[in-house]
């Protein structure tokens, strides 16, 4: 189960505890932080990471939206991620307002190079949020997908994801 784009753990932890009471389920929680590494509710990345590690309820932590890739790389570089599974899905950059619309310039090269830096930090799951599109992700697999694996987490066969598509 993946909780995405949250600003604190207040609503996640009670639900994660309930989910855990039902069985062994992989739980990921992703947060949106600003360029200084804080959520809208004022929690720092290091506080979120420390709480997630200490809770015993959440298997992985992620950061999505809120920042561009180079800011997120800088923030992640300063964190003690330990053995957590970590995801990073920043925005393509920062949107510009033109009239009544928000636009992201095509900066897929910059995005992918910054994401390669993130992958080299040992982040397990990488992707994109606002302003990215399938072309970004395709380029990302070609660029950051070649980054060497920096750290390997202990294999947890009991938590391997299985998927099934059903059309009932």
Name each model-derived stretch.
Residues 2-168:
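Domain-level signal for soluble alpha/beta catalytic cores
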């Amino acid at each position: 189960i993946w909780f995405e784009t949250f600003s604190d753990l207040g609503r996640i932890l009670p639900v994660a505890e309930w989910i855990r009471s039902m069985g062994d389920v992989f739980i990921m929680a992703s947060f949106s932080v600003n360029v200084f590494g804080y959520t809208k509710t004022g929690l720092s990345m290091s506080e979120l990471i420390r709480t997630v590690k200490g809770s015993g309820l959440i298997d992985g932590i992620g950061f999505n939206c809120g920042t561009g890739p180079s800011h997120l790389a800088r923030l992640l570089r300063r964190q003690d991620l330990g053995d957590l599974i970590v995801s990073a899905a920043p925005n393509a950059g920062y949107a510009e307002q033109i009239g009544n619309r928000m636009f992201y310039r095509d900066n897929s090269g910059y995005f992918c190079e910054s994401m390669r830096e993130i992958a080299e930090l040992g982040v397990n799951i990488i992707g994109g949020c606002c302003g990215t599109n399938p072309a970004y992700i395709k380029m990302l697999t070609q660029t950051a997908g070649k980054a060497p694996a920096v750290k390997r987490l202990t294999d947890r066969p009991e938590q391997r994801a299985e998927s099934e598509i059903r059309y009932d």
